[in-house]
């Protein structure tokens, strides 16, 4: 008998329990059967709903020993702790860039390596890989420069260009 006999027909991922496969399938279907009674937000998994409830109660029992910042669950504290250690355990197999959070790696792969640009500027028709990049691009049309150098007062449309500029001081 195979160790993981339950196989997702969508992606081929294997599971040892049928219920785990059933939960996994929600990542493909988008099914979100768990609903927050406070705000109506929906979740695919009960554990995510329970974690979300803490945002309403403001309960943050997990405290960083380095800086005192508090978190609603242990996993968020663990991710935060990497900001102190510099640990980046998630590596992009396409370019080797490392990330401290898996979801940021996934976003990177989608935005940089997929070639897809589904976010289209209504002003000029240019496509972008993420909503974030489109939002930044829109500033080229509006002239908005919300990122300001504290040394000289010069404004920039993106945080990236502000950091590039700061190296000149």
Curated annotation (Swiss-Prot):
GO terms for cellular component: nucleus. SMART domains: ZnF_C2H2. Keywords: DNA-binding, Metal-binding, Nucleus, Repeat, Transcription, Transcription regulation, Zinc, Zinc-finger. A zinc finger (C2H2-type) spans 6-28, 34-56, 62-84, 90-113, 119-141, 147-169. Its main location: nucleus. The keyword Transmembrane helix does not apply. It is found in: Nucleus. One of its GO terms (biological process) is regulation of gene expression. InterPro entries: Znf-C2H2_11 (IPR041697), Znf_C2H2_sf (IPR036236), Znf_C2H2_type (IPR013087). One of its GO terms (molecular function) is zinc ion binding. It comes from the Eukaryota. Transmembrane segments: none annotated. Belongs to the krueppel C2H2-type zinc-finger protein family. May be involved in transcriptional regulation. This is Gastrula zinc finger protein XlCGF62.1. It comes from Xenopus laevis.
